Every structure is written in structure tokens, then in C-alpha cells.
């Protein structure tokens, strides 16, 4: 007798997370694939990410998703098939999967998701909006008739949802996230320290030293190319510089999204509660 395995999949532009029903088995890998000569897959997930920005001309390492939408369905399907193999065994074949999808998908984008998922060796597929999945994951009262707001800052997008009675009553998705913050760090380091760094270095600086309000004052030595001399160089970057760069991005974009969500659409929540 074969036991049916059930697992949830969180498809992000930067990371793919897969967990079983009891959360005992979890896979968390970078959503990235490395391909040689546009034909041969040589690495997926974290191994492909380690090759990012270091590959020769014949190898490309990139994510098959951009801004929460599928850019290369074939490569995304290959990554998912590889990762789902970790949930299969002699006694568990063709699992049931629940997949989170972004808000405000167009019909074409939704068909792209279905095409990728139906190509996997799975038994049943269910889709759930990211806002609802986020709220359930952090233990919010999603079935209550009161509104609960969830803000998910991803790599490429920021999703803002108001959940009530198990549904997304208000949902907005904005095309900026951690990648925009990383670009702000790259720009700041180039402008203030005359040093050119890559995205991976900027991400490490943001994660290690970035804060939006109050945080510990520290610094980190980073290496890159001097923008004037063109030779390898280094600079000590204080956490204040990192935090100012990402705070400016958050103030200009994320808070604007919150204000838009609150001021424009809260009347929909009141209408839903009175219906």
C-alpha cells in the first residue's frame, strides 16, 4: 500500500520552500538553475546560487521567476521536480501539493503556473493565495471576521493583504522588495566608497547589518573593484550607511503601499463585514 504524501510549496523569486504536512521535513533552496550552452543543466538550488556571478561565458545561472511571475517554465519545472524527489520514497509516490501563488496574477500568468505544476509527477494540485498562506503560517486568526493585515517583503515583490473570514479582502502587490534594497546598497557603496560590488555581497551586507529603525552600530570589510583605479580594493562599510540606503527604499515604496492599501480600500473590508 502506498501512503499519500502531502506537502506545501512556497514559490518565491529568490527561494523555494517545501514542507510536509507535519513540518518535519523541510526543503529550502535558492530558486536558481545553472545551464551550460543553453542545454545542459549542471546545478540547481543552492549549488547554482554559489555559481552566480562566477560563471564562465558558456554557463548562465539565473532564476526562472521574475517579479513573482514565471519567466522560464521549463527551468522552473526542472527545479521543482528535483526538489520534490526528496519527498518521494518506495512507500510514497506522487504527493498531493499545495502551492502558494502571488496576488493579482493575469490569466496568462496563472496558465503558466498551471502548465508548470501539471507537468510534475504529483497526484493533486491546490493553489492558495500567498496572503492567506502567510497568515496561516504565522498563526493569525484567518477565519475571524475581523481584519488582519499581512505584509510580505519578498525578493522581487512586496505583498500587502488584509485577511478576513478566510479570504483576502484587500490585496496589493508592488514590484519591489529585497532586490531593490540590494541595488540601493550597491549604489550607496559605489557613491560613498568608490567601490563596485556584486548583488551577493550587497545581500550579505543587508542581512548582516541592515535595520530600519534602531540597531547595533557595527561595520564590515568588503571587497570589490575600485571605480576610479579599476583595481581590486576594499572598504569598511558602517551599518549606518547600509541602514540609510535600505530605509530610504522602504520609506519611499513600502510605506507608500501601506498607505495606499489603508486609505483606498478599507471601505471594502467594512462592506464585507456588514454584508
Feature annotation, model-predicted:
Residues 1-150, 163-275:
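Nucleotide/phosphate-binding catalytic cleft detector across ATP-hydrolyzing
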Amino acid at each position: 500500500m502506498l501512503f499519500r504524501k502531502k506537502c506545501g510549496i512556497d514559490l518565491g523569486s529568490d527561494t523555494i520552500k517545501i514542507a510536509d504536512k507535519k513540518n518535519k521535513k523541510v526543503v529550502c533552496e535558492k530558486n536558481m538553475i545553472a545551464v551550460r550552452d543553453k542545454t545542459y543543466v549542471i546545478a540547481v538550488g543552492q549549488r547554482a546560487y554559489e555559481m552566480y556571478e562566477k560563471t564562465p561565458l558558456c554557463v548562465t545561472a539565473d532564476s526562472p521567476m521574475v517579479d513573482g511571475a514565471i519567466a522560464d517554465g521549463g527551468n522552473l519545472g526542472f527545479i521543482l521536480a528535483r526538489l520534490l524527489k526528496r519527498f518521494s520514497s518506495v512507500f510514497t509516490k506522487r504527493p498531493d501539493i499545495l502551492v502558494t501563488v502571488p496576488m493579482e496574477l493575469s490569466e496568462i500568468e496563472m496558465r503558466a503556473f498551471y502548465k508548470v505544476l501539471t507537468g510534475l509527477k504529483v497526484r493533486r494540485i491546490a493553489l492558495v493565495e500567498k496572503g492567506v498562506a502567510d497568515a496561516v503560517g504565522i498563526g493569525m486568526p484567518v477565519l475571524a471576521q475581523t481584519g488582519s493585515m499581512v505584509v510580505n517583503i519578498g525578493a522581487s515583490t512586496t505583498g500587502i493583504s488584509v485577511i478576513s473570514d478566510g479570504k483576502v479582502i484587500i490585496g496589493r502587490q508592488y514590484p519591489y522588495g529585497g532586490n531593490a534594497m540590494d541595488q540601493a546598497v550597491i549604489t550607496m557603496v559605489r557613491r560613498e566608497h568608490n567601490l563596485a560590488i556584486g548583488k551577493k555581497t550587497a545581500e550579505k551586507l543587508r542581512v548582516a547589518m541592515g535595520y530600519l529603525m534602531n540597531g547595533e552600530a557595527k561595520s564590515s570589510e568588503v571587497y570589490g573593484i575600485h571605480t576610479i583605479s579599476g583595481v581590486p580594493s576594499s572598504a569598511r562599510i558602517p551599518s549606518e550607511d547600509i541602514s540609510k540606503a535600505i530605509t530610504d527604499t522602504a520609506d519611499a515604496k513600502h510605506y507608500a503601499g501601506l498607505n495606499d492599501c489603508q486609505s483606498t480600500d478599507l471601505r471594502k473590508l467594512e462592506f464585507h463585514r456588514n454584508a
